[in-house]
Design a protein with these regions (language model features):
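C-terminal motif of bacterial Sec signal peptides marking the signal peptidase cleavage site
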Residues: 15-18
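Multi-bladed beta-propeller domains
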Residues: 30-40, 73-89, 156-173, 201-219, ...
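Low-complexity, Pro/Ser/Thr- and charge-rich linker/hinge segments at domain boundaries
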Residues: 37, 114-143, 215-216
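Contiguous beta-strand segments within globular domains
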Residues: 38-59
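Short, conserved, GDST-rich strand-edge loop motifs in beta-rich repeat architectures
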Residues: 131-144, 234-256, 298-302
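Conserved, compact domain cores that house catalytic/ligand-binding motifs in diverse enzymes
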Residues: 132-210, 215-216
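Hydrophobic beta-strand positions that form the internal "hydrophobic ladder"
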Residues: 186-187, 229-232, 292-296
Length: 302
């Protein structure tokens, strides 16, 4: 019996500490301006399953109170730096307000007094966002490329997982990954320098292609899949970098030569056209229309 009483008291104490009561401050003045936040989320339209829109307030203040209100129980947060929204309560609030809107009110404490900004809104869509976003994770400089990975993030949370890390491929350069209409079962990406080649994933099979031919400028570079999954358009480029003395981190990347080719997956053949490979032009960044009937690209004189 004593053991049961102990657990009851423990649960009660956890409940008291877990449900923090945010006392509403006495507002000295309404500022009648919007708070300066980063990222600039004011007026955003949110998919109903998006992860919490955490942000930083860039105005001056010693402490912040943020109230997110709509149908259902509001969320009240106090912060001194970044505003981190609890994910469970965020999901409940989005679900209750899909097709409606949320009002966000920010109050600032300065020298012991509270000031309130004008509220801004987030509209909540009834539509959901795709489950994942894939990207290359690399340090923000051209030099440190020996540590990188192709990653994916679950967009309903902040869970990040690796698709492939270059620690497993000889610390080479891995880049230019694309999917066919967002389908993770049809993917390509390039590996440079060590173990060089184009990795092609389709139909449960994975193969590495040597894509340089005597008739093309380079190995495959920037890709886009035909919606049928039967072909991929690639650019072939000779790329250079220029550096500025005025600022060491300003880099210009440009092509000295550039063509577009089409790769037939089933035949393992490459072909092109004078419209896509003109010696007097630079053709780049191919992109198929959603119905696959048009191929768009950038072109300019050399």
């Amino acid at each position: 019996m004593r053991l049961n009483i102990f657990y009851i008291l423990l649960i009660a104490l956890c409940g008291l500490y877990g449900c923090k009561n945010h006392q509403q401050p006495i507002i000295k003045e309404n500022l009648n301006i919007l708070p300066t936040i980063y990222p600039e989320y004011q007026g955003a339209l949110l998919p109903v399953n998006i992860a919490p829109l955490n942000f930083k307030i860039q105005d001056e203040g010693d402490e912040w109170m943020i109230q997110i209100q709509g149908k259902g129980n509001p969320i009240t947060i106090t912060a001194h730096d970044a505003v981190e929204i609890p994910i469970k309560r965020w999901r409940q609030l989005l679900h209750q307000n899909q097709g409606g809107s949320l009002s966000i009110t920010v109050s600032s404490r300065k020298k012991g007094e509270w000031y309130q900004y004008s509220p801004f809104t987030w509209d909540v869509s009834t539509d959901s966002i795709d489950s994942h976003l894939a990207y290359r994770l690399i340090e923000p400089t051209y030099a440190n490329w020996n540590s990188m990975a192709i990653c994916q993030r679950e967009l309903s949370s902040f869970k990040e997982t690796e698709i492939i890390s270059n620690k497993k491929s000889g610390q080479n350069c891995i880049n230019c990954h694309t999917f066919n209409q967002g389908n993770p079962n049809e993917m390509d990406m390039h590996m440079r320098k060590i173990n060089a080649g184009t990795i092609l994933i389709q139909g449960g099979a994975c193969q590495k292609l040597n894509t340089k031919t005597p008739h093309t400028i380079s190995n495959f570079v920037y890709p886009d899949w035909h919606p049928s999954g039967k072909q991929i358009a690639f650019s072939t480029n000779l790329t250079q970098m220029s550096f500025y003395d005025a600022h060491p981190k300003i880099i210009e990347v440009y092509d000295t030569q550039s063509d577009i080719v089409l790769y037939d997956i089933s035949k393992n053949e490459v072909y092109t056209s004078p419209l896509l490979a003109n010696a007097n032009k630079l053709e780049n960044f191919p992109f198929f229309s959603p119905d696959g009937k048009q191929l768009y690209f950038c072109t300019c004189d050399r």
